[in-house]
A protein has these predicted regions:
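N-terminal anchoring/stem segment of glycosyltransferases
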Residues: 1-74, 93, 211, 291-324
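A glycosyltransferase accessory/donor-loop signature
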Residues: 5-8, 160-177, 181-324
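Conserved glycosyltransferase catalytic-site signature
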Residues: 13-17, 81-85, 176, 213-218
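A structural signal for short, well-ordered beta-strand segments and their strand-loop junctions
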Residues: 35-37, 98-101, 106, 122-123, ...
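A conserved donor-nucleotide-binding helix/loop in the catalytic core
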Residues: 69-100, 105-108, 112, 120-125
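Extended catalytic-interface subdomain
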Residues: 131-182
Length: 324
């Protein structure tokens, strides 16, 4: 299995190092390839977008990662989320892959997860972020049907019939924090086609919808369904579970992630060679190494967290601990 994450200047550099460190810490038997796609300079970037820290690059390579440049053809700085799609072009054609957002750590034996490459899937750790239903506008069903129809996909077979009509979970929708498939080139081509359609020539049902920053997550279920995939089965429960943790932002991670996830994060970051690199990124220096993360952790009861993420963010900001 080939693992793909996206590097880049600044924060992404150090998140990539932490991902690689956690993979080697938690799954030393992993024998696949870890590919860090690094955006190359080009007309869609106003300043150099790639990894600039030579020490970080050397440490990634020491961990066995392959840093490979890719070109931004369609998105670049105007939509950085599109990097995860454009980066698929660096992977070898016809070989199964799994993509992870760079703000993820590996907390268990990823090499033992039984990915079924012929049935692509993605993260279900999502909320009702898109579409936003207007009072007099089309509902969930009409919007998602229009998108499926535009790409010639069977809409009915994508539905979760255990959920009521017009409830958002009835309709196939993923978090693009991880996804896997059988062929990155095919996945790349279909994602680009779907994203450009949604951006440049959307169905009329989308006229009131804001597509940013969710463009990748709107296209993802269409591509996965079109390739014969769907919602992940129990074999993949370890992703967003005991095997990987999408921590997103360090203050949020310390506020709400499990004791085990935080212990792995800190253990992976503890070797001196890792510490020397990660301390170059101020939020990691302060949160992980200077104890600010542990102070954030004391503010919250993991068994009784606020329902809305914004409430967690606000509580952290009130204490002066928010950093990214």
């Amino acid at each position: 299995m080939n693992i793909l994450i996206v590097g880049g200047a600044g924060r992404l550099t150090y998140e990539a190092v932490l991902f690689a460190a956690s993979l080697r810490h938690s799954d030393p038997a992993f024998g696949g390839r870890l590919i860090v796609a690094d955006p190359a300079p080009g007309p869609l970037w106003p300043k150099p977008p790639g990894i600039a820290d030579a020490g970080a690059r050397a440490l990634l390579e020491e961990f066995g990662a392959e840093v490979m440049p890719f070109e931004a053809v369609h998105f670049g700085a105007s939509y950085p989320h599109g990097n995860k799609v454009e980066a698929l072009a660096v992977l070898p054609e016809g070989e199964p892959f799994v993509f992870f957002d760079t703000d993820t750590i590996v907390t268990g034996a990823l090499s033992e997860v039984p990915f079924h490459s012929a049935r692509p899937s993605a993260s279900m750790k999502r909320e009702a972020t898109w579409p936003k239903i207007e009072l007099y506008g089309p509902g969930y069903g009409a919007i998602w049907r229009a998108l499926h129809d535009r790409l010639g996909l069977d809409f009915a077979s994508s539905l979760d019939l255990s959920q009521p009509d017009e409830h958002w979970e009835r309709y196939l929708y993923f978090n693009a924090a991880w996804f896997h498939g059988p062929c990155p080139r095919l996945f790349h081509e279909r994602m680009i086609k779907a994203m450009l359609m949604i951006r440049d020539d959307p169905p009329a049902e989308l006229v009131c919808q804001e597509i940013y920053p969710w463009l990748d997550q709107i296209a993802l279920p269409l591509v996965i369904h079109g390739l014969g995939g769907g919602r992940p089965g129990p074999d993949l429960e370890g992703l967003d579970g005991d095997v990987t943790c999408h921590w997103r932002v360090l203050p949020l991670a310390y506020a709400r992630e499990s004791d085990r996830a935080i212990a792995v994060l800190e253990a992976a970051a503890s070797p001196n060679r890792v510490k020397r690199v990660l301390k170059e990124y101020d939020p990691m220096k302060r949160m992980i190494y200077q104890g600010r993360g542990r102070k954030v952790r004391t503010l919250f009861d993991r068994e009784n967290l606020p329902r809305k993420e914004q409430a967690i963010r606000n509580a952290i900001r009130r204490e002066g601990f928010w950093m990214r």
